[in-house]
Amino acid sequence: MTATTIKEMLHDLQSELDQKSPGCLDYSISKVNRVYIRGDVHGNFDWLKDFCERENTTTNDVMILAGDSGLLFYGKGKTREKLLKDICHQAPITLLVVRGNHDNRPINEGMTLRWNDLVQGNCYWEDEYPNILYAGDGEMYWMRYKSFLTIGGAYSVDKFYRLHMHWTWYPDEELTDEEMRKILNDWSGCETDYIITHTAPLDHEPTWLFMQGIDQTVISKRMEKFLQR
């Protein structure tokens, strides 16, 4: 997939977001001006300031980060994590952060799930960083008259290497069976415009990006099989 193709896909998505269509939720007022999507920045936010200046954003614009943002990777109170959060907090934009396999769960950092008026759904955030929202797994959000279901988490293919090197790895990176059942019970039969995930359904795995030297037969596909449903 080329950069041009991805740009065209994002352009088509933005065009769809400008059209109202009913989903499972039906709110008559959208407080969000624009929705952007990006993933796997892994703690690199050097682009954010220029992006906000170019797009002339405000905190009523939402950037969805589809996993592995780095904002909940280093640990609460750690210098690197605080620096990244400070950078994002200073940017005139709201981030809706979906959990990746290299992200800690917000609840593990002392946050609680609560209603947010801007994205019209339940999410996590720290009071000192009100424009950094962490999406709940299996939560629905309503922006630009469209519904967004977020399902975070994935299996780390480099899990054993990380453990061997004593690098950060989160044992609850995948959804539990109970969490999967709850998502199915909550939203089965309910229309949603977009499902934002970190990993892909099994039939849509980007096999051309698989890491060389890793035996795929020993890699957990629980999340991919679940999303395939």
Where do the language-model regions lie?
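Short, intrinsically disordered, charge-balanced linker/junction segments flanking boundaries
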Residues: K221-R229
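Acidic/glycine-enriched edge-of-secondary-structure segments
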Residues: V32-R38, H166-W169
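Short hydrophobic patches on amphipathic alpha-helices
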Residues: C52-E55, W187, L227
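Core catalytic region of metal-dependent phosphoesterases/phosphodiesterases
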Residues: I6, G23, R34, R38, ...
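Histidine-centered catalytic micro-motifs
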Residues: V41-H42, T199-P201, R229
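Active-site-proximal loop/helix segment associated with metal-binding centers of metalloenzymes
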Residues: T4, E8-Q14, D18, P22, ...
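Short boundary motifs at domain starts and secondary-structure transition points
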Residues: C24-S30
